[in-house]
């Protein structure tokens, strides 16, 4: 709604990034931040990490955004075609995450394939970059038959840069979600880690089963994971099953050196 005389001292870097969400407006600003209007105040909602990625792109004027609501969570999703990236902001949790789709060979498209969204015919309809039309469905764990890679990275684990020995790591994930047959009948969770700030990751990625259908007491445990001064853990699931991570627990021994 236009308000004669109202003025916000913040430019816009991409016309396609401007969308309405929850009685407000969100857009990509001319300083490479993502802003949300709070009255006439352009509040910054992007993080430094998101902004650092955006500033790497040669062109951001082609950025496009969409919004939708899922189980009470309102999402602002912005895609950078030239930069090859998609970021999503959850207004309920105030957290960002990245989305990436894959082709038939399992290679990354460099962005989320969804290009448009509309509530129609009692469904949450989407259109993808190839012109396909589908809908968002919690019971579908792929995208038009293409694999969806779920990747979750935790915050760095450290103790003032002193040596730490990790003897055990357990993740609480919804288990017993296996399918009746085919890929996903014995779903797996994969763990790797980085001890150098995310520059390199372990080649050996131990697997832990997520439990076949009905195995609800299955546990996800990794042991004897060595020493480090700082570590980032990363969990990956590619099987077409539900991925619900609740919490994680680790047992570590401290050293004074």
For each predicted feature, which ranges?
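A short beta-strand motif characteristic of beta-propeller blades
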Residues: 3-7
């Amino acid at each position: 709604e236009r308000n004669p005389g109202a003025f916000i001292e913040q430019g816009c870097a991409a016309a396609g990034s401007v969308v309405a969400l929850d009685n407000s407006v969100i857009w990509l600003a001319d300083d490479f931040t993502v802003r949300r209007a709070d009255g006439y105040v352009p509040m910054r909602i992007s993080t430094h990490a998101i902004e650092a990625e955006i500033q790497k792109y040669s062109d951001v004027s082609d950025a496009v955004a969409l919004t939708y609501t899922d189980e009470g969570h309102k999402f602002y999703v912005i895609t950078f075609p030239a930069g090859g990236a998609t970021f999503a902001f959850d207004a309920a949790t105030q957290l960002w995450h990245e989305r990436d789709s894959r082709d038939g060979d399992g290679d990354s498209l460099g962005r989320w394939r969804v290009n448009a969204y509309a509530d129609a015919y009692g469904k949450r309809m989407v259109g993808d970059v190839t012109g396909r039309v589908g809908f968002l469905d919690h019971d579908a764990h792929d995208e038009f038959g293409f694999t969806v890679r779920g990747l979750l990275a935790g915050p760095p684990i450290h103790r003032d840069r002193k040596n730490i020995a990790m003897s055990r790591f357990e993740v609480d994930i919804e288990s017993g979600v296996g399918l009746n047959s085919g890929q996903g009948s014995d779903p797996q969770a994969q763990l790797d880690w980085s001890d150098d700030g995310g520059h390199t990751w372990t080649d050996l990625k131990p697997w832990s089963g997520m439990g076949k259908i009905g195995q609800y007491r299955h546990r996800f445990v990794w042991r004897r994971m060595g020493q480090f001064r700082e570590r980032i853990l990363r969990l990956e699931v590619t099987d077409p099953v539900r991925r619900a991570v609740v919490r994680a627990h680790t047992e570590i021994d401290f050293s004074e050196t």
